[in-house]
């Protein structure tokens, strides 16, 4: 649960920093001294980031799709089932995450018999929706 709180805090911080930087209309100071960090760090522009929270009922899933700038999924509740084209199905539990590289065709959703709440972080760009995931594909056959 602690890991979920940390991941949720990170996602919310990214969304908040996107808003604050955009509202200020000022680029962050490169390499500014900050007593909370050791070494040079830079707050990067997050204007294209988006964070969404979605609930999937047991067995619900997306169609095959890709994101032209990638996607990060975080499991808040339940279990997530995902598959990247040409790879085996993978399941993740609470506090675990999965990154999908740009333009990689994949699907994700809840496992059979258990609901899922996921956070998805988008990096801008577009989603290309493809065909539905069949029951056989969902079951790994």
Predicted regions span which residues?
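A short, N-terminal "cap"/entry segment at the start of jelly-roll beta-barrel domains
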Residues: 2-53, 63, 91, 128-141
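Ligand-binding loop in jelly-roll beta-barrel domains
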Residues: 102-128
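A short beta-loop-beta micro-motif enriched in histidine and acidic residues
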Residues: 46-48, 58-74
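Short acidic-glycine-tyrosine-enriched beta hairpin
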Residues: 56, 86-103
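Short histidine-centered beta-strand/loop micro-motifs
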Residues: 62-67, 84, 91, 109-110
């Amino acid at each position: 649960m602690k890991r979920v709180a940390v991941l949720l805090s990170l996602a919310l911080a990214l969304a908040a920093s996107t808003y604050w930087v955009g509202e200020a209309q000022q680029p962050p100071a490169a390499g500014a001294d900050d007593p909370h960090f050791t070494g040079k760090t830079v707050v990067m522009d997050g204007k294209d980031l988006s964070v969404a929270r979605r609930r999937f009922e047991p067995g619900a899933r997306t169609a095959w799709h890709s994101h032209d700038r990638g996607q990060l999924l975080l499991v808040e509740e339940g279990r997530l089932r995902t598959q990247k084209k040409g790879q085996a199905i993978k399941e993740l539990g609470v506090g675990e995450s999965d990154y999908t590289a740009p333009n990689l065709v994949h699907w994700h959703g809840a496992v059979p018999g258990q609901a899922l709440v996921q956070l998805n972080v988008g990096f801008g760009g577009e989603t290309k929706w493809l065909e539905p995931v069949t029951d056989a594909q969902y079951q790994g056959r």
